Amino acid sequence: MLSILIPIYNFKVVDVVLELKAQAEKLDIPFEILCFDDASSTHKDTNITLQKEANIQYRELNNNIGRTKIRNLLVEKAKYNNLLFLDCDITINKPNFLASYAPYFNSGHVVCGGVAYQKEKPEKTQELRWKYGRNREEKNASLRNQSPYQSFTAFNLLAPKDIFQKIAFNEKIIGYGHEDTLFGIELKKEGVTVAHIDNPIIHLGLDEHQVFIEKT
């Protein structure tokens, strides 16, 4: 039924993964959570404790392959047709987060849940990224549905696995977020329906000013 796919890089994911597991168990469906670490230098000692959990597959890569390739690897290894992509630097503040996606399982549609940011200001060095996220990325579903393909992001995304037989994340793209833009264009070309719903997760991993400027 559901494969939850989380690429990890230098972020502690134990709490959010266990929350996802608890929500999936309440749905009473077959599920798996694939957590693939992209050769991180931090938090592996903590994250590896997920290996003992049922329905969770935690794997550490020997070499860093980048978020595009690791997403494609997660798709390849997923065993169910409903794929839920989540970034690792998140928190979930909705007890019905997975249940809100359930009506779209096996729909054949791509569904974007959206992103939110904490209301409290972060440290000064991260304030630019936070303001950008609050002003440019945090949009409700009605606004995103006005231009569904332009608003596409794989940060919080439900998609049927068979779509990836036609389209994959482009591994030649190295710019920040541009692989999502290109994937959205390909979805439009293939006539795949992209729907946006109000089911956001909170983005925690804010880059410092200089790093964010270099990425964009």
Give the positions of each predicted feature.
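Conserved donor NDP-sugar-binding/catalytic core segment of glycosyltransferases
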Residues: 95-126
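Glycine-rich, basic loop-to-helix element that forms the pyrophosphate-binding segment
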Residues: 61-78
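A conserved acidic beta->alpha catalytic loop
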Residues: 35-46, 90-91
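Short aromatic/hydrophobic "clamp" motif used to bind/position activated sugar donors
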Residues: 83
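Short, well-formed alpha-helical segments that are part of the catalytic scaffolds
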Residues: 10-25
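A recurrent flexible, glycine/aromatic-enriched loop bordering the glycosyltransferase active site
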Residues: 140-159, 174-176
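Short, flexible, basic/aromatic active-site loop/helix in glycosyltransferases
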Residues: 114, 130-149
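Acidic donor-binding loop at a coil-to-helix junction in glycosyltransferase catalytic cores
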Residues: 176-183
